[in-house]
Amino acid sequence: MKILKNVALLAMLFMSIVAVAQQDNVLLDRSFWKGDPDLKTVNQKIAEGNDATALNENAFDAVIYALLEKADDAIVKHLLSFEGNPVDKKTHDSRIYLHWAAYAGQTEMVNFLLDKGSSVTKLDSHGYTPLAFAANAGQKNKALYEAFESCGVNLLNEKNESGANLLLLVSSSLSNEEELNFFTRKGLKLNSTDKDGNGIFNYATKKGNIDFLKLLIKKGVDYKSSNKKGGNAFLFAAQGGRGYSNPLAVYEYLKSLGLDPNIVPKDGYTPLHRLAYNNSDPAIFELFLTAGADVNLKDAEGNTPFLNAASRNELAMVKLLSKTVKDFNTTNNEGQSALMLAVQRNNPEVTEFLLNNGSDAEVYTEGHRSAKDNKGNTIAYYLVASFDSRKPDEFDTKLKLLQEKSVQLNTTQAEGNTLFHLATKDNNLGVLKRLSAFNIDVNSKNDEGLTALHLAAMKAENEEMMKYLISKGADTKIKTDFEETVFDLASENELLQKQNTSLNFLK
């Protein structure tokens, strides 16, 4: 117990140090780099105390932002001269600077990093080398690929974890025969496929350039065959690209080729499952529904298109898909219903719609026993998990909606946690205060033998949450199963030590 506690405290201390390091650091403000600062300005900011090597909470740093915003090469090289910025520094998603330089199409910086000995084989957390990462982002700069070639990289061997080569990865961004020929002349085969048998036509449909798709068909590319998992191009079209969704015309074109919109692969994850998350064009949904796509079909994880829509999509689309829902209280493999997902991830409007149109509130309150997911959490757990400090009004509205349906908020959740435990674990005083009126036992122990106050003593960044719990009746004398008092736990909290927080109120 003590070992786990100390590990948790060290992790929190590290995050605190990172937060302090990047607080008010203008070099970690992307808008600063969008302003195209010169080297003199950058040096001035560094002299003022802005750390040129610090990573923010998402592991981005000044070098990355300078590369992404195409700052002058002299500035990037200067930043790379700092001891804390080695060429293979591990950053966001385990990427090194070569990933970012290639992604941004910064050929001169790519050459500079290669000359400095940067790894060309380093994989990011998604299994992409620097060059594969660039191709997947749509980089078509010939000089970029030739820079890697000159450094000994065999373009034919560059693939991601799915076995997609550079041609497949970049294909959704290609628009004409000249661009296509650059890659085929390098030896990349037009009929190459990934491990699942997906060819260039499928990959190109992610950003469906219909003229380019027609060019591929003219060149004899196979577009009709299903892949090894039983999928077709509709699945890739539904996937879209980063910040891009295909319009209706692309789906109509694929249908005109004789491809089936109602394709059901082996894992059950259909195009409708993917589109249900964020498609906002009712005509696209109608195309699939007319073709027989089923909003009730479960994929391998037990999710239906309707469950996906309830978790993220706008109310109008949820209403549209709800017309053919057989059971509003269907759950996925984790025991999560549409209402649970909507309460956690979507807006109050969708929550209210589900409560009033099919999500039977009695299911959640009958006999004062709330329906639980497979871990033992009720809808109240999902309410606490939904809190966003930027949108507190949404939480308050959802809370009111659930109160109107007499949902019990003092039911014990998974692992013996009360809502007080959950809010304290998240260090969320705002939620804690909102829950104080619901007759929750503030001194209840969870399965680890900890009260909410114990957790606050271990995790708190200051005394405020502990004092609030005490004001609500939390007992400072209750010990853990290891005979530790609240004072003992707080005394070992390095975040509190760092701030010289007085703990006399716990004695």
Where does each model-flagged region fall?
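Ankyrin repeat domain, specifically the short helix-to-loop turn at the C-terminus of the second helix
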Residues: 44-51, 77-85, 111-119, 146-155, ...
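N-terminal leader/linker segments that initiate helical-solenoid repeat arrays
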Residues: 19-84, 88-92, 125, 491, ...
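Bacterial Sec-dependent N-terminal signal peptides
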Residues: 1-25, 502, 507
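Intrinsically disordered, low-complexity segments enriched in Gly and acidic/Ser/Thr residues
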Residues: 249, 256, 262, 267-270, ...
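Ankyrin-repeat boundary/"N-cap" motif
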Residues: 23-33, 54-67, 89-99, 123-135, ...
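Ankyrin-repeat-protein effector appendages
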Residues: 21-37, 155, 256-260, 324-327, ...
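Solenoidal tandem-repeat scaffolds enriched in leucines and small polar residues
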Residues: 138-273, 278-285, 291, 317
